[in-house]
């Protein structure tokens, strides 16, 4: 999921910051990425690199080749034209095929000592900067981007340097000690460093406060809550709750595991909006207890929702081993002597020095998991775990 994808990137940034490093990240933008994929290269790549053969390969060929498209304007329609390149956008296969097509770029990135994260055409390159080697590390990043640009050109993709973004992450103290960077060179362009970037619907600032993201979520929730208030008299309680969950609560829950340990101010803003939403759904006045309204709707408060999401992700990672990267961050606690805690299904909490780094998944996950009662932690059934974990957090309200 997009949330897991961002969790991985931010975990690396947080842990690097704990060792006194800043991280520079470049978010790449492609021009018409899905429309320029070469069919012959794609088919060869899925066959040679991913083992797609036989009937599956023939099906994929029929899906890609001899596809036609027309343009309608009013009552007029153009003649059908064959699509020599590209994969259909908005399809389930589109992002998967794009990822298969660009899979070789991970080796290019690793050859220069940089990290690469890719979710369909959302591609990010980043590298941790140490004071002693900053110049050589920035040069390695630019060399990597130059090599990637050559690869993109050879494979029919066009990198848009003007729309690509760069940002430098780190603690406020660390960023203040760094020299000013002129920018990152890419595709004959120089990208100036931004204070924040938006990726996959998440606005991320250089200090990872998520203030701008929370402000955007609050603004969106306020707009939709007000719209719901106008039509509330025409809805039943059940209909109002369904609309609220689909249009408003979903915005509160999106990537909320990343907001754990955000500022008290941000948490209060989100909680205030959830309280307003609950009053709108149940048609109650402001003097009603918001806690009781949330219980009546069976909605967990904001902080509990964050813990609940982290618990679900951790349970899934421990029981399935996937995604492998997150699984590698979690270690079962093994006491040096035979103690009762040896069979408590506990996780080892890493020793991170800074509060900034303690927002990393590798720290937040085990601390949240270890606080869950043993009888819930040891459940293997996903549905039973979800139900009992939610009941547990409700008992704490």
Each language-model region and where it sits:
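Hydrophobic/basic alpha-helical segments
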Residues: 1-397
């Amino acid at each position: 999921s997009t949330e897991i994808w961002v969790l991985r990137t931010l975990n690396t940034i947080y842990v690097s910051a704990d060792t006194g490093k800043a991280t520079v990240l470049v978010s790449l933008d492609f021009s018409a990425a899905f429309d320029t994929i070469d069919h012959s290269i794609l088919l060869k790549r899925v066959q040679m690199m991913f083992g797609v053969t036989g009937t599956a390969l023939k099906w994929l060929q029929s899906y890609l080749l001899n596809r036609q498209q027309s343009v309608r304007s009013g009552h007029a329609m153009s003649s059908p034209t064959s699509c020599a390149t590209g994969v259909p956008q908005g399809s389930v296969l589109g992002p998967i095929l794009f990822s298969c097509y660009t899979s070789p770029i991970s080796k290019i990135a690793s050859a220069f000592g940089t990290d690469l994260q890719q979710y369909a055409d959302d591609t990010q390159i980043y590298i941790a900067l140490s004071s002693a080697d900053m110049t050589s590390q920035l040069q390695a990043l630019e060399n990597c981007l130059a090599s990637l640009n050559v690869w993109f050109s050879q494979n029919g993709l066009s990198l848009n340097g003007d729309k690509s973004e760069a940002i430098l992450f780190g603690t406020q103290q660390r960023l203040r000690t760094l020299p000013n960077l002129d920018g990152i060179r890419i595709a004959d362009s120089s990208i100036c460093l931004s204070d924040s970037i938006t990726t996959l619907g998440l606005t991320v600032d250089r200090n990872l406060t998520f203030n701008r993201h929370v402000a955007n979520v609050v603004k969106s929730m306020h707009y939709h809550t007000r719209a719901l208030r106008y039509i509330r008299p025409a809805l039943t309680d059940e209909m109002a709750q369904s609309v609220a969950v689909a249009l408003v609560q979903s915005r509160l829950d999106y990537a909320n595991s990343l907001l754990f340990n955000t500022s008290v101010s941000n948490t209060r803003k989100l909680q205030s909006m959830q309280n307003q939403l609950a009053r709108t759904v149940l048609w109650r006045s402001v003097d009603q207890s918001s806690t009781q309204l949330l219980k009546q709707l069976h909605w967990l408060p904001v902080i509990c929702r964050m813990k609940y999401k982290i618990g679900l992700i951790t349970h899934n990672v421990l029981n399935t081993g996937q995604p492998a990267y997150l699984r590698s961050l979690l270690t079962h606690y093994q006491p040096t002597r035979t103690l009762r805690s040896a069979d408590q299904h506990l996780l080892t909490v890493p020793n991170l020095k800074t509060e900034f780094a303690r927002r990393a998944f590798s720290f937040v996950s085990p601390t949240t998991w270890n606080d869950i009662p043993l009888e819930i932690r040891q459940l293997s059934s996903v549905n039973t775990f979800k139900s009992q974990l939610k009941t547990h957090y409700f008992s704490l309200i």
